[in-house]
Amino acid sequence: MFQGFSQNAIDFLWGISLNNERGWFMAHKQDFTDYVDVPMRELGKEVFSALAEDYPKQDWRLHVCRIYRDARRLHGRGPYKEHLWFTIERPHERFESVPALYFELAPNYYSYGCGYWDAGAATMAKLRARIDNDPKPLERLARRLNKSKFVLSGEEFKRPKGDAGKLLNPWYNRKNIAIGYDDNPEGVLFTPQLKDDVLDGFRFLMPYYQYLDTLAGDMEPNR
């Protein structure tokens, strides 16, 4: 049962960020297992199980990331990830763009929300076309989001793609899109309450997740 993370988890993540090499990791591998990996998997499984009960028609998969980076994509970085996460998303092809619900733990923050790792140009073009054709559903969601603790994010175009109005321009003129809540690694992070907070957040975000997920079924607009 998930009991919260601990300061030991944060200490490990700071340690691996400052000593990202095999010798240090092997000397602290048990710390990683006990304080980071096991609690992350417990949190992911319990959140996933609760959501599966709430939304039985959704076909989801839980993925808990490994700490090892892909050796083919180090790009000068160390062999270990310095922040860890789990995602809940529908099954998809390897390079298919799908949104996910996520929880992430880093040495200096924790975060949870929904969105794309990389939405891709085609997905964002579909979003703009949907806004052009029927803005009202997203207007309702945008107003609701603006009253919440969650924040819209994602790289913006230097030259706007168009003018969808003050409310929807932040959605319209992005290269990627996510909705998240960040907090300092303290307080509730170290308690079982974190699971309930993440669950409540995911339930709040479900209309946004579903809105984004259905973009895959839209026709790609003519360029």
Q: What would you call each of these model-derived segments?
A:
Residues L105-A164:
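Compact, glycine/acidic-enriched structural inserts
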Residues R69-A71, R90-H92, P107, Y116, ...:
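Short, flexible loop/turn elements at secondary-structure junctions
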Residues K29-V36, Y116, K126-I131, F190-L194:
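Short histidine-centered catalytic/ligand-binding loop motif
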Residues A52-E96:
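Hydrophobic/aromatic-rich structural module bridging two neighboring secondary-structure elements via a short loop
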Residues A100:
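Structured soluble/peripheral alpha/beta segments that form catalytic or ligand/cofactor-binding pockets
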Residues M1-G15, G44, I131, K136, ...:
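Long, solvent-exposed, polar/charged low-complexity segments
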Residues Y80-E82, S97, A106-Y110, W171-N173:
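A short, structural micro-pattern
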Residues W14-I67:
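Active-site acidic/histidine clusters and adjacent loop/turn architecture
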